[in-house]
């Protein structure tokens, strides 16, 4: 279950109902998908082949189709980041630059952990700490950035409004 940390006051929201309510009030789509469907050989696997990535997409194809039909998404892929990723530190520096997109940014966490820091409606930032099974959609035009948690590894399904993906605006 995702958890929230509000930057300015460093308070946390950890209760499932309260997390869902907070995100809904901020216009952030949050869903919990059944991660137990993932085959054991793909669980916590950060060295994915193209075949592994295709298998992950197939496992969650119904959920991807459902959210895509509801929200107009047209493309998806799988990304894997870990200490074995070439230039991981450079990538993280780039990901941690505050930006926005003209469409929403959707991630489903398959393995590992990630953090989206999002500017709230009141202008203050909050972290959404994500774990396997969490799907989040950062609203279009919301200032945000992404980073990894201390384990420095994540496998995520990215879902896009257009087949070209998204373009960050810094």
Curated annotation (Swiss-Prot):
The record marks 104 as: May play a role in transmitting local conformational changes. It is an enzyme of class 1 (oxidoreductase). One of its GO terms (biological process) is L-methionine salvage from S-adenosylmethionine. Ni(2+) binds at residues 99, 101, 105, 144. Binds 1 Fe(2+) cation per monomer. Binds 1 nickel ion per monomer. Its cofactor is Fe(2+); Ni(2+). GO terms for molecular function: acireductone dioxygenase (Ni2+-requiring) activity; acireductone dioxygenase [iron(II)-requiring] activity; iron ion binding; nickel cation binding. Pathway: Amino-acid biosynthesis; L-methionine biosynthesis via salvage pathway; L-methionine from S-methyl-5-thio-alpha-D-ribose 1-phosphate: step 5/6. The record marks 98 as: May play a role in metal incorporation in vivo. It catalyses: 1,2-dihydroxy-5-(methylsulfanyl)pent-1-en-3-one + O2 = 3-(methylsulfanyl)propanoate + CO + formate + 2 H(+); 1,2-dihydroxy-5-(methylsulfanyl)pent-1-en-3-one + O2 = 4-methylsulfanyl-2-oxobutanoate + formate + 2 H(+). Signal peptide: none annotated. Its EC number is 1.13.11.54, 1.13.11.53. The record marks 107 as: Important to generate the dianion. Keywords: Amino-acid biosynthesis, Dioxygenase, Iron, Metal-binding, Methionine biosynthesis, Nickel, Oxidoreductase. The keyword Iron applies. Monomer. Belongs to the acireductone dioxygenase (ARD) family. Catalyzes 2 different reactions between oxygen and the acireductone 1,2-dihydroxy-3-keto-5-methylthiopentene (DHK-MTPene) depending upon the metal bound in the active site. Fe-containing acireductone dioxygenase (Fe-ARD) produces formate and 2-keto-4-methylthiobutyrate (KMTB), the alpha-ketoacid precursor of methionine in the methionine recycle pathway. Ni-containing acireductone dioxygenase (Ni-ARD) produces methylthiopropionate, carbon monoxide and formate, and does not lie on the methionine recycle pathway. This is Acireductone dioxygenase. The gene is mtnD.
